Amino acid sequence: DHEHLSFQKINGPVLPFEDATFDVVTSLMSFRYLDWDPLLAEIKRVMKPGGKFLIIDMVTVPVAISEYPRLLKDKMRTKRDQKANAQFDAALQKLVSHPDWKKMLEYNPIRSEHEMKWYLESRFPGQKMETLNMAWNSRIVAFDSGPVEKGIEVKLSYP
């Protein structure tokens, strides 16, 4: 418990907060499952001017041969982290092997890297998605919107 931190469960894209409430809005491993345009409009509504939107999520993309050194390094780090955090790793494995998790993935597949990258980088010009960890067919990525000012809207449709 922390007096300046709270977690909220929401249903649908409407966020139950006043306009300009937050300095930072985060999405951890969930943005890929949501309807991006309505949610992003709500996130911008609840952010204070100059606020940031931070995302850590998973995308799907096969590893290229030129990326094998990075893949090996990330695999070794992941194995080391799993050993160091065995209790967390066991809980994670239990979660992702649960039938409800598998059913959820059936209806909400992981987004492709190029789709999420295009979406975020086109709506926050000058900002870049970054790979945190690489696996054979997926990556953990991070995105920092940078300071977001009110009234700046990039209206685009997916090509």
Regions found by a protein language model. Give the residues of each.
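Conserved class I S-adenosyl-L-methionine
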Residues: 54-86
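Conserved SAM-binding strand-loop segment of SAM-dependent methyltransferases
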Residues: 2-18
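Conserved S-adenosyl-L-methionine
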Residues: 126-136
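A conserved beta-strand element that flanks and buttresses the S-adenosyl-L-methionine
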Residues: 26
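Short, glycine-/aromatic-enriched active-site segment of Class I SAM-dependent methyltransferases
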Residues: 93-106
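Short alpha-helix
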Residues: 106-128
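A short His-aromatic
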Residues: 29-33
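A short glycine-rich, Lys/Arg-flanked "PGG" loop and its adjoining helix->strand segment in the class I
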Residues: 37-49
